[in-house]
């Protein structure tokens, strides 16, 4: 049964048109180039090359290799650093990651899918599908067809294939095509999906240390050729957990990203000792960023509508509301619409949508598991009620995600190295949405991709932009933070 007192307790754990809109967003920054078109026609080409954001698609390459002892088939390692915001890279605590980014392939940021929450985005990364398509629409949600509730921290949900079979993860396609996979604690890896499981699979365990995760990857790579996996995926929740508990700007956050970076350095050294560091493809990415919370950015729901009308609330910290009946849904929606039109201060900093009116760029309406009424707070704002938070206490957690996936504070990480990415060294890559990762992995492993929402088909886009990635990210973060004051 839904209880407001439990809100947040379990949360610590582009289509072509979208791409065009996104590129246009950055093209607007090139005011000098646009003006020059009108008055300096002879210089148009030069200005476009210097200033404009322009996607040029280049393919990824694959192939086997020999490290001097063993023949390795095309191999890719994907390591997810949950909650690692793109700009964390420039805080001075991650020299190993920064070195990898500077010497290999670095995308300024990876665009998460909406909502920018852990489970939906991890399943998007391995299926190439938007959450509305693969069905894991939040960390917690209700399925009106089965009458069951999904909660990410409940083992029975992670082991029930009926939650996961709307999407086919990359390891299923790999196993079907005789490519061995090894999956460490990735959402969805504990179930049989479309008749397949990973060759090697580790269930989630909060107590597993970063070094144990690193050792597990190297252990798999040390297997004999007949047993060795070509696709390895590993999940690390540590940055996200600390970001929630202490906030994205805390000393504790800087400590944990430093610890993560040290272990990444040890992993790279392990690859070098095996003489495979130049050949094995390794991708470090994240699912979303993190925004700071504040007692000054709370949106109180108590006076907006009768909270007892809510039978299920989904997608914390967002408000996906579902009543016991259609009449309850209508009441909740109309109450929020009417309140939003008032002149009260609490009527600001959020938007209300019916499911059918959710912005199309979020791709978040075409699934029965998506709640009928949505209250979306502005970035950094939190929905609360007297039932789950006392005004006399400091609001927790101190860091939250889930907001608009184009917000600078929701931006994710993408760094890659290895033989398949050699054509991209020294190139300035353009940001892309995480629906593209599936195609990249399929291309590296020479797998026939299943239908997905990616549009680059295993390629990567280049950008033309004079600003450094560091300047770009930090300026956008500064502007985003200025709106929170």
UniProtKB/Swiss-Prot annotation:
Extracellular face residues: 52-485
Annotated Gene Ontology cellular components are:
membrane
Q: Where is the active site?
A: 118 (nucleophile)
Q: Does the keyword Hydrolase apply?
A: yes
Q: InterPro entries recorded for this chain?
A: Alkaline_phosphatase_core_sf, Phosphodiest/P_Trfase
Glycosylation, residue list: 67, 306, 338, 453, 467
Start and end residues of each stretch annotated as Phosphodiesterase? 74-404
Q: Where in the cell is it found?
A: Membrane
User: Which Pfam families does the UniProt entry name for this protein?
Assistant: Phosphodiest
- Supply the EC number(s): 3.-.-.-
What processes in GO biological process is this protein linked to? Answer: nucleoside triphosphate metabolic process
Ranges in the topological domain labelled Cytoplasmic: 1-30
**Keyword Glycoprotein attributed:** yes
Chief location: membrane
Give the transmembrane ranges: 31-51
User: Can you tell me which family this protein belongs to?
Assistant: Belongs to the nucleotide pyrophosphatase/phosphodiesterase family.
Question: How is this protein named in the record?
Answer: Uncharacterized pyrophosphatase/phosphodiesterase C725.05c
Task: Give the source species.
Answer: Schizosaccharomyces pombe (strain 972 / ATCC 24843)
